[in-house]
Regions:
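Substrate-binding pocket helix/loop in short-chain dehydrogenase/reductase
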Residues: 91-92, 99-104
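Residue(s) in the substrate-gating loop at a strand-loop-helix junction
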Residues: 135
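Conserved glycine-rich cofactor-binding loop
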Residues: 9-10
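Active-site helix of classical SDR
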Residues: 115, 151
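The beta1-alpha1 cofactor-binding region of Rossmann-like NAD(H)/NADP(H)-dependent oxidoreductases
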Residues: 34-35, 56-68, 97
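C-terminal helical subdomain
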Residues: 177, 194-230
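Conserved glycine-rich Rossmann-like NAD(P)H-binding loop of the short-chain dehydrogenase/reductase
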Residues: 23-39
Length: 253
């Protein structure tokens, strides 16, 4: 059994890799930072020396690299974890457009391409799991993080649509979306925000995500508070949520 994880050098991606290693999966770890990837590999093999780990240094923010990654792997992948992603904080008219384009390419385009390519293979075998890492942000408008929230909404809607297509084919391929709230990862530093709300540990989120994914759960929402927030987002009008979200985001400055 083999799993491919993007964004595997830190945070949720790293900890999902660790959880899958404990379950005996061979791993292909993908990220930009080769030093961190080597450290993750070393740490995992210290505790799980009965598996194989391959590391690939790659930036998935370009379509060409995503296609090259698929061709380079050329392997029988049982689980795909699309975790690579980051956020940009600030007023939409003032945030850096080049950074936002990189965000869109990483959070949206890479997920789209890798899901399509590996899903085609999984459908031929009629088995496999795909976990797309979204966010609770994907269910609501997010002023002051407009591009990030919108990118996660894309992941949610894409995954929901694919799930229905798989259902109508009676496919055994399972697709899940992970929708956490604030998590203790490097995300805050990259997005240049300071979450005031209590964050879950990335280890807890990863363990919860893997358990639920392997059960075939579609919406994976860790934490009682975030489950409650998702319920509220279903019943409260978006304009009210946007006003509330702005006040919450403003406190992160």
């Amino acid at each position: 059994m083999k799993a491919l994880i993007t964004g595997a050098s830190s945070g949720i991606g790293r900890d999902i890799a660790t959880e899958l290693a404990k379950r005996g999966y061979d791993l292909i770890l993908v990220a930009r930072n080769i030093e961190k990837l080597n450290q993750v590999k070393e740490n995992i093999l210290t505790n799980c020396n009965n598996i194989n780990i391959k590391i690939i240094q790659m930036d998935v923010s370009t379509p060409e690299n995503c296609k090259n990654l698929y061709n380079q792997v050329n392997d029988d992948i049982d689980i795909l974890i699309n975790d690579a992603g980051f956020g940009v904080f600030g007023d939409f008219t003032k945030t850096d457009i080049d950074k936002e384009i990189q965000l869109i390419n990483t959070n949206i385009t890479a997920v789209h391409i890798l899901t399509k390519l590996f899903l085609q293979d999984m459908e031929k075998k009629n088995k496999g799991h795909i976990l797309n890492v979204a966010s609770i942000a994907g269910f609501m408008p997010g002023p002051l993080m407009a591009t990030y929230y919108s990118s996660k909404a894309y992941v949610v809607r894409l995954s929901e649509a694919i799930r229905e297509e798989l259902r109508r084919k009676n496919s055994n391929v399972k697709l899940s979306i992970l929708c956490p709230g604030p998590v203790n990862t490097n995300f805050n530093n990259v997005a240049d925000v300071n979450f005031k709300a209590k964050s879950l540990s990335s280890e807890y989120v990863a363990q919860y995500a893997v358990n639920e994914m392997l059960k075939g759960k579609f919406y994976i929402v860790p934490g009682a508070q975030i489950k409650c927030l998702r319920f509220i987002a279903k019943i409260v009008p978006n304009n009210i949520i946007a006003k509330f979200a702005y006040k919450v985001q403003e406190r992160k400055r």
